[in-house]
């Protein structure tokens, strides 16, 4: 008889695909590290979002901590990467940098391009509750939840997302203070350059909160750092704030009011090192002049060697 071979069919094995959320549009070598310009689709803003990530040379040895940098009104991820010089010190101390955008782009909402301090470039790091903004303008949850979660998947071998700090400038300084205070334990430290410190009490805050959150000012309290620090429970490391004395938004327009935040922090038993520096304005010349102090401050709380 003819012998027949018997084949046993094994069940097929389906390997879980590695899903990359981000597309690298450009990679630039800088200070022996890499600046990656990324784009991805956001579930919360329902638009394509851009973000820049700087990876220091230290990550060739182990995972590195990261600092989240939130930019101010009219900015996109490129402003700080091109003007702050933060990457030099991130490379020196060994931490990554994350530069999100300041609003959704391409939402095509009527009125979002009508002024420079509202809409495009001015998402104000809130989750909007008012129509038509609530569909796309969810920058608070986008930055502190969705973006960090997706980056955590993308850079799971390079960045330690349990060792984060946060900093910001102007609207971004407000966003950093708010994000730190609303997410206890998520960030090791928080610093700010010329932050909008008491938005309930200034024209920028009234305009953005009124449109994004509605007319009920009690809802605004959830995004006001001066209120949030009064309600905070737990440990807070010293908060460093630099403010230029020649900044017209501070001295003339009274949009920033860091003294209000410092006073509220003191009353609540927390320490704020508010440094009013003569001669400096609101621009990146000011930021780049003091970014080394901020980088060193973050490195300390991230457990890095100084």
Listing of model-derived features with the role each one plays in the protein:
Residues 21-306:
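Non-catalytic cap/lid and distal C-terminal segments of serine-dependent acyl enzymes
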Residues 1-19:
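Short, Lys/Arg-enriched N-terminal segments with co-localized hydrophobic residues
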């Amino acid at each position: 008889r003819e012998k027949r071979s018997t084949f046993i069919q094994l069940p097929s094995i389906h390997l879980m695909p590695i899903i990359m959320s981000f597309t690298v549009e450009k990679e630039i070598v800088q200070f022996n590290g890499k600046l990656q310009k990324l784009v991805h689709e956001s579930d919360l803003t329902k638009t394509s979002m851009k973000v820049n990530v700087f990876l220091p040379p230290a990550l060739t040895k182990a995972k590195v901590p990261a600092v989240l940098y939130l930019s101010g009104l009219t900015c996109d991820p490129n402003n700080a990467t091109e003007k702050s010089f933060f990457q030099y010190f991130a490379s020196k101390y060994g931490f990554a940098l994350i530069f999100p955008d300041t609003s959704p782009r391409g939402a095509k909402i009527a009125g979002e391009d009508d002024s420079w301090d509202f809409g495009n470039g001015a998402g104000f790091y809130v989750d909007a509750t008012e129509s038509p903004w609530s569909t796309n303008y969810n920058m608070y949850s986008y930055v502190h939840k969705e973006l960090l979660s997706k980056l955590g998947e993308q850079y799971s071998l390079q960045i330690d997302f349990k060792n984060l700090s946060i900093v910001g400038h102007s609207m971004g300084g407000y966003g950093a203070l708010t994000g730190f205070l609303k997410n206890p334990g998520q960030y090791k430290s928080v610093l700010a350059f010329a932050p909008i410190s008491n938005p309930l009490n200034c024209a920028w805050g009234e305009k953005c909160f009124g449109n994004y959150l509605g007319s009920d000012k009690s809802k605004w309290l959830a995004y006001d750092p001066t209120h949030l620090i009064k309600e905070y429970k737990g440990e807070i490391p010293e908060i460093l704030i630099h403010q230029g004395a020649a900044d017209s938004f501070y001295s003339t327009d009274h949009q920033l009011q860091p003294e209000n935040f410092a006073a509220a922090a003191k009353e609540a038993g927390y320490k704020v090192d508010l440094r009013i520096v003569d001669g400096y304005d609101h621009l990146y010349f000011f930021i780049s002049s003091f970014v080394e102090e901020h980088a060193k401050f973050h490195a300390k709380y991230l457990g890095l060697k100084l």
